[in-house]
Structures are given as structure tokens and as C-alpha cells.
Amino acid sequence: MRIVFRVLMIAAVFAVVSARPAVAQGDAEKGKAVYAAQKCTGCHAIAGAGNKNIPLDGVGKKLSAAEIRAWIITPKEMETKTKSTKKPPMPDRYSKLPAADLDALVAYLATL
């Protein structure tokens, strides 16, 4: 029963992810502020600033906005799906970001 519930929850998350706009126009500047406020540089780097172990340079060219969003809100599922071995693993606390902040963060990362 727990497995069925988990599968349904994952399906629901992907339904929500695909139903949202891929990138909220004009939110990239706010997304840059969200990136800083959430202290993403503890694990990630952009243009050499931050933790260089997991650089995000070019992430917007490598991943769609929906994939970026999925990495933020369902990192464990994305790690499994992509067989990622990056350490430390992405924490799952960002799924609780307010929708406007999440949209802005995705918009910012999509510009990289």
C-alpha cells in the first residue's frame, strides 16, 4: 500500500510540474535573490563563485525548465532517474519553497 501511495504522489508531483509554466518571464532577477537567500552556494557554484564541486554553469542549456524544477522539488527521484552519483545529494527541503520563489529560481537557473 505504501508503494502505491508513493507512486501516486510522484505521479501527482510530475503532473503539477508539467502543468506549470516552464519559465516565469521576468522572474530571473528575483530568482537570483532566491538562490542567494537559500544559500545555494554552499553546494553549487556559478561562474566560479560558491562550492565548485557542483557547478551550475550552463544548466539552462543542459536541462529544460521542467527538469530544473524536478531537481529542486523531487531531488531523490531525479537522482534515481538519472543515476546521479553527485555528493552530497540534493536536499529535499526546497519542495517547500513558496510557488513564486520556486518559479523565480527556475527562471534564473534556466538563464545560465
Where would I find each of the regions flagged by the language model?
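Positively charged n-region of N-terminal signal peptides that target proteins for export
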Residues: 1-6
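Axial heme c-ligation environment in periplasmic c-type cytochrome domains
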Residues: 51-60, 75-104, 112
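Bacterial N-terminal signal peptides
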Residues: 7-16
